[in-house]
Amino acid sequence: MLKPQPPQQTSQPQQPPPTQQAVARRSPGGTSPPNGGLPGPLTATAAPPGPPAAVSPCLGPAAAAGSGLRRGAESILAASAPPQHQERPGAVAIGSVRGQTTGKGPPQSPVFEGVYNNSRMLHFLTAVVGSTCDVKVKNGTTYEGIFKTLSSKFELAVDAVHRKASEPAGGPRREDIVDTMVFKPSDVLLVHFRNVDFNYATKDKFTDSAIAMNSKVNGEHKEKVLQRWEGGDSNSDDYDLESDMSNGWDPNEMFKFNEENYGVKTTYDSSLSSYTVPLEKDNSEEFRQRELRAAQLAREIESSPQYRLRIAMENDDGRTEEEKHSAVQRQGSGRESPSLVSREGKYIPLPQRVREGPRGGVRCSSSRGGRPGLSSLPPRGPHHLDNSSPGPGSEARGINGGPSRMSPKAQRPLRGAKTLSSPSNRPSGEASVPPTSAALPFLPVGRMYPPRSPKSAAPAPVSASCPEPPIGSAVASSASIPVTSSVVDPGAGSISPASPKLSLTPTDVKELPTKEPSRNLEAQELARIAGKVPGLQNEQKRFQLEELRKFGAQFKLQPSSSPETGLDPFPSRILKEEAKGKEKEVDGLLTSDPMGSPVSSKTESILDKEDKVPMAGVGGTEGPEQLPAPCPSQTGSPPVGLIKGDEKEEGPVTEQVKKSTLNPNAKEFNPTKPLLSVNKSTSTPTSPGPRTHSTPSIPVLTAGQSGLYSPQYISYIPQIHMGPAVQAPQMYPYPVSNSVPGQQGKYRGAKGSLPPQRSDQHQPASAPPMMQAAAAAAGPPLVAATPYSSYIPYNPQQFPGQPAMMQPMAHYPSQPVFAPMLQSNPRMLTSGSHPQAIVSSSTPQYPAAEQPTPQALYATVHQSYPHHATQLHGHQPQPATTPTGSQPQSQHAAPSPVQHQAGQAPHLGSGQPQQNLYHPGALTGTPPSLPPGPSAQSPQSSFPQPAAVYAIHPHQQLPHGFTNMAHVTQAHVQTGVTAAPPPHPGAPHPPQVMLLHPPQGHGGPPQGAVPPSGVPALSASTPSPYPYIGHPQVQSHPSQQLPFHPPGN
């Protein structure tokens, strides 16, 4: 008789159904079934009466245990046993102690009884739990049921048991089925399990990929047969999802349906009278006009880019799924960095953004004090351009806090005006000059325009002695200042903010000497600015007026094709047209008033006070003031000149744009150079009067502003000391950024880095401002200064495409003339049709490498009169290294601002170490003695493309001295590039280049000759070699040549 099992054996784990046959047979030796199995729990239930115990022998507990009693049965025991102790590896014991609560707690290993110690048998028996089994008892009767569990005594519990008939009768009757029977081991002869698959649970992988690859999905062994879908005729063109706007139901049909089926009547009115005011249409003229006006406004609104952008954004027009949901996109114009390299798509880390973006603006405002970076018209008077050129960043900062997007050029023009009144040597902090003069436009922070303006560089060599840099020097470095930002240039009479169009569009401003007539504009602008700027005082106003007069209409802004035009709300084309008109006006003024306005006398007196430098005799104060040509490399847009005519339009711009002023006391920071006073930067004479070195040019750090030689200006000296009758060509400090974009942010000019050695202090005041400006702009020469440092006359060609030609002065044998070095991407400084710039530099000027397109820097000399030789600034100490290494004098006590350590080439802004200077000997095998072919001068030959101007400054390394420029040029002619011949003398405005020779000795200023034709200067530092085309004989334009007289030491 079957007996209930103890309570501890009450739970049973379910096992997968077996599919193979397993037979538990009683062995003669009482062994357990050969197959081991997972232990299955045994359920003790009251069983109906079963076969008598004596009927047949059954597998008894002893027999089962005889198969081997191993404590660590690797099986899942029923709840009856606590978790078993695993004695051998792989043993798995899963169980819970239910009935056996030993007082010792769970850690105690369970004790197994009987067959539970036979792990192999338990493994198989538990594996077949739930399978159909036939139990044959001793009386020969076979019972069929579903195996449920077994006890430790091997008592089998079977569910749904019924007696199995000898012959199949179809199925058991319901009354014959017993829910559960327990067979005692003594009664069981044989237990047969049919169709058991012991590998069922392990033969398949249950990972998603394995299941997906399995042909039988969800247990289906047969593949599905696809059936053709019969959609009928309705799947034709009836369903045009795109063109069908009815939304499925016609509103009237819906209302009708609802009324018929639900009794709901609608109150819908298609006119929406409760929400709108009906228009009563009539034929009156007024109504038609209003209707037309409304239609026009609707068209304007719908055609506006902002509207279209918003609609496209709402509708996701033209955007891919990636752009909609996963792409990270940044607005290119939202955050512009001053780096030369355009970073439009790139992520700029926050620290770098903070360094670069506000570089100029914040610092500027703080240093200038009066001029907050954001205020549109900060009182600039307090800050004089000369005085303070805040860190390079200030310029980089958007003018007026304006976005950097403004074209740098536009900003620069404002800079041109300097306050003449500012006391000389005025500390940068205290600028008595009206704010306009003080503030140099900030270069836009935009990545397009790294602050090139001298302001950026300004920290470098502005000499305290010239608190106010001449307008030219004050002008931001060639890096263009965005015109869009309106800068009030105090000196310029505070250019009125340009019309929004101008302000928005980056425009090339060509530097044109402006006539006095424009002074009125400046005065007007000053008055306007004074009214607008609460901080301006009467004194400042007076300064501004003086500066305005001097400044004249300094420059016109020509809309440039600068990359930033997209930023401009107004089309650049309009700006260009306006600028052209203004240029014409300015040109007329220039031609009409070459002499310059009387303001010059005032400026001269001021300059004398400030600089203690004799003013040039040029009568026109209004004479072209020095405006550093914007550095084309930065924006790639043409340089911007200050033009009176444009001032009117610029007035708003000036208001909008804060001016940044250069700090005259700032010292150039050249990590690779010994600290030299960069302050020598020549202060180009103010246009009104040649200020010998009214203010040191402030080097502009372009590109990264990290250029080692931040103050690299090619200085254009507007005034040459000439007979008053002659209008001196304007020389504009042309700041070329030597810094590589990567370098930017390395330092803003270190104000104290270089002792401010002012050449003017050491040199006689007689030195013309040109020399000073040239020397200051040039910076230390690459090569040790020779007794005669010669400047390469840089004659800007009238044609931007033409590189200026370098004309050596044959008569000045010992001094090769070196054109200022421009970067390989030469930029053209074209000042309108009138070339009027002299670029002289002993040191290479590096335009930002950033500009991919070579833009020759053409500084056009306005009309210079060949007959008058002007003395170059004597102030400037001879550059330590002069272009010609042959000169016996190696280094002068007063090193040029850009003096490099011997043998060390300055690094180009491009970031390439400028070790690869072309030394005359090294460059070409051509013997120095070889004279350059005259063809260079011939007008016919022209540079196919603007060639970079290379000034080769031989280091002391230069193997041989060249007796004359011809030799040097020949030695340096490395490439086959042909220099463009200077424009014909007959050209409407032959550009004249002033050759500035740094004084040979500490004392005498060298006299420079202005060759009629431009000379392309090749900078040795630039990677791309450019031939120097110098003809010793300037015979073709002898009249225009100014002889060089070597200054005595």
Curated annotation (Swiss-Prot):
The modification N-acetylmethionine is found at M1. Coiled coil: none annotated. Residues 120-197 form the Sm domain. Residues 96-119 are annotated as: Interaction with MPL. Pfam families: LsmAD, PAM2, SM-ATX. Involved in the regulation of stress granule and P-body formation. The modification N6-acetyllysine is found at K205. Expressed in cerebellum. Belongs to the ataxin-2 family. The modification Phosphoserine is found at residues 27, 109, 236, 304, 333, 337, 389, 407, 453, 496, 499, 560-562, 597, 637, 677, 683, 687. This is Ataxin-2-like protein. Residues 314-326, 508-519, 578-587 have a biased composition (Basic and acidic residues). It comes from the Eukaryota. There is a cross-link at K346 (Glycyl lysine isopeptide (Lys-Gly) (interchain with G-Cter in SUMO2)). The modification Asymmetric dimethylarginine is found at R359. The modification Phosphotyrosine is found at Y116, Y262, Y307, Y347. Residues 328-340, 475-487, 824-845, 878-902, 1033-1042 have a biased composition (Polar residues). One of its GO terms (cellular component) is nuclear speck. It is found in: Membrane; Cytoplasm; Nucleus speckle; Cytoplasmic granule. Residues 361-378, 454-466, 681-697, 935-944 have a biased composition (Low complexity). The modification Phosphothreonine is found at T45, T635.
